[in-house]
């Protein structure tokens, strides 16, 4: 009985162990199945087709030690274009600290307090300072201050600042050879007189600050001296206070807005000139005043489009409408290129150089009107055409300087130079009158004791 009972008990225990083993095997296999599925899925993602559209498994990327980025709400839609432009203009003026534009109902613009009795006060100053004469050697020519400049900010175009540097170097070369003082300005002295008009407050300031300067010579930054030997016939203008390049018939008969050009002009340091600046300036404040005068000039001057007032049109308007007041003291020069238009000049430099100076008609100043060297684009001409023309003008002028030292550009289209004269051990200007004049001008010679 016991054996039977014992055998039954033994068989029951074995059955229980089998059932327990089956239950344990099933529960232990479940995690293994999950692991296998994950491994297969991972292998599928790595090795399987990437372009399948029937099966997509989200990719999970765990990144450690990186900042947490919090999603933000989408920005509001932009305002209408007109509102954006108004906001941009307002913001620009606030950022730069400019005053609001002068309105037509505001008092007329003024350069400052009216200066009276200037000629007498200047004469007294010159008498008290004989070490700063208004006339200098050679031949007692007038003391001249050449004035130029550019905007205070860097150029938007990376090449622009380089072009301005070369243009200034050109002016320094000419002034050094001819004994002229030079002033380079990079500040807007009056926020209302921007753009073309910035020269007016500058000229007034320099006149009263430098009574020793008999003449102020304004030269635009994009005007290049291209005849480094040419000397202005100073005595021709002894009784005139303003010298402009242009044509009298175009100004007084045709009333053309391009009858003269203000890119390069001479103005005498005297009361008459201060009065002219005072009459000239009220047409230049930025904003509605400048726009209104631009419309007036378009009506009164032939060929002028109705854009905002520029200083050149304003001066011509004064000369035409107030000729009795200003005309007698204005000399309009056309016998040489005090302000030559670049487009008809820059491709003829080689021809001019081959012909030499027999006719004495090399272009004195080449002015790149319509080109803006500081901008990425030009006003009226392709930017590349302007850049190429300026490069040729710089090199044509620079060759006249390099020649003094025995070098020249390989061509006017490159900055590369070559030696054109062997050194002999003698002074470079020995036996060469032209070189002697440039290297050792008479105004630099010590006076005999």
Swiss-Prot record:
Protein's recorded name: Probable glycosyltransferase 5
Topological domain ranges for the Lumenal compartment: 50-449
Stated role: Probable glycosyltransferase that may be involved in the biosynthesis of xyloglucan.
Similarity comment text for this entry: Belongs to the glycosyltransferase 34 family.
Membrane association type: Single-pass type II membrane protein
Gene3D superfamilies registered for this protein in UniProt: Spore Coat Polysaccharide Biosynthesis Protein SpsA, Chain A
Keywords assigned: Glycoprotein, Glycosyltransferase, Golgi apparatus, Membrane, Signal-anchor, Transferase, Transmembrane, Transmembrane helix
Topological region Cytoplasmic: 1-28
Transmembrane segments: 29-49
GO BP term, pick one: xyloglucan biosynthetic process
Pfam families in UniProt: Glyco_transf_34
Glycosylation sites: 89, 413, 422
EC nos: 2.4.-.-
Comp. bias intervals (Basic and acidic residues): 1-14
Cellular component annotations (GO), alphabetically ordered: Golgi membrane
Record-linked InterPro entries: Glyco_trans_34, Nucleotide-diphossugar_trans
Protein's cellular compartments: Golgi apparatus membrane
Region ranges (Disordered): 1-24, 74-109
MF-aspect GO terms: hexosyltransferase activity; UDP-xylosyltransferase activity; xyloglucan 6-xylosyltransferase activity
Main location: Golgi
